């Protein structure tokens, strides 16, 4: 049937039941093999919308050219703030089942960022290898960062579900192999495999939430995801410490198998996404940005590898470390330049960096997450190294932080849904985080525990405002067809900021402590048990030195947060407006895997 025969008018229109068409404000809707909701984001001026703007032709579903879409979007944006009508198709899902399954999957992937931190001494002792133990955590973070740029591209080529299943498979496989590891090298390699899946899961869950929810109600669900993410990062050291003290450290990884299996089964059965035309292998070879992907991943790994080696050895002028940093930086710059001119689906789409608002959002998210990961990593270290807490008690003392973060992540999602604007929330979050980091500068070795716990909640209060709004703002800045790429790009830049933050914090801490002890690096590596066994006079000196090193870290964080706050002024405010209309459910026997059909 010709697509031109399917247009109806909302005002005084006649419904053609035989053709199975519905119409809203002149926008013709087709029945598909999957139930969906039409979500329209109306503009200030009405424009004629073709049927292909709503349901693309089957032969062109996967020919998404980010550059063309973003160029048209930028031209329209320059003429008016919201001068075009963006259409989003929303599949019907049982949100009471799908959302908890996605949350559990995200929680497990996020948990593995920090769950090993309190178990590192035990694992190192078991394998009799302390020199490589830091790579247990670094391997996961490096692999997670490396896979993020490719997630959005693979989603547009293969579809969300297939990519999600692949990522879950790698995460579960890596978890099983980590639990069965017999030496340190085995464990580190398997942590990298686990990280490939974990990084993809974290990005994909956010992408899928944006696919199954309209923009105006999305903050509520995204707020729940942000709560799960923040809670996992804070709960990781507690759970890891408890497992190590009650049973073997191997259950830190084995625990993912039954939990992940349940979540995967629910996702397979209950998650419904819009049909996706499968691309041919020939078309995949023609459109995928292989050069950009290889350069980005290699560049990231080399940069973080160089920073990590420099931090652990303290010898930044070594030839190998300088080569890692220089070559990695050159590859990353080359990838960005290449993606600016390539006609393929770029791994780092230039429009996200050329658009002033989206570039500011990327900077805002990166600076915040750099501080958040430093905070989440070094506050438990303060409790252990200076206050003498064991891993469990250190986690207990961070419970107020976790409670504040979870409460405000959820609350901000609901407020954002009601308010319809994200910029005021970002301002509140950044101001609170700058104040919280500034207050932490006053903490020393003798500060009362209640005061320390109170000051830490100030930063966590602000953090609750900064997980979700930048993501929603990024999605609102571009058309729905670019949502997956926008989400993946923000997640990649944000996570990379966190990875760099942890490494820079390690550099600051090691350098400060080493200088205080005349170049002796031993004191920077002491565990809380070893500190408590030192002679009283030396113990006091070591703790004061640690407190001084932490103070330098908090000063660094405060400066970075202030720079991030300046980037907010370049973010463009957009109202989150959407209208939804249900379309008849799919017929019996229809499959979600089939592409949309004309009727």
Swiss-Prot record:
GO cellular component, one term: plasma membrane
Subcellular location: Membrane
Recorded topology in the membrane: Multi-pass membrane protein
Highest taxon of source: Eukaryota
Pfam families for the chain: MFS_1
Composition-biased stretches (Polar residues): 14-27
Primary location class: membrane
Biased composition range(s): Low complexity: 1-13
Composition bias, Basic and acidic residues: 44-70
Annotated InterPro entries: MFS (IPR011701), MFS_dom (IPR020846), MFS_trans_sf (IPR036259)
Disulfide bonds: none
Keyword terms, alphabetized: Membrane, Transmembrane, Transmembrane helix, Transport
Region (Disordered): 1-27, 41-86
GO-annotated molecular function: transmembrane transporter activity
GO process annotations (BP): basic amino acid transmembrane transport; transmembrane transport
Coiled coil, from the record: none
Residues of the signal peptide: none
Bilayer-crossing regions: 97-117, 135-155, 162-182, 192-212, 223-243, 251-271, 290-310, 321-341, 359-379, 396-416, 423-443, 452-472, 489-509, 552-572
Assigned protein family: Belongs to the major facilitator superfamily. TCR/Tet family.
Name the UniProt record assigns to this protein: Uncharacterized MFS-type transporter C16A3.17c
Species this chain originates from: Schizosaccharomyces pombe (strain 972 / ATCC 24843)
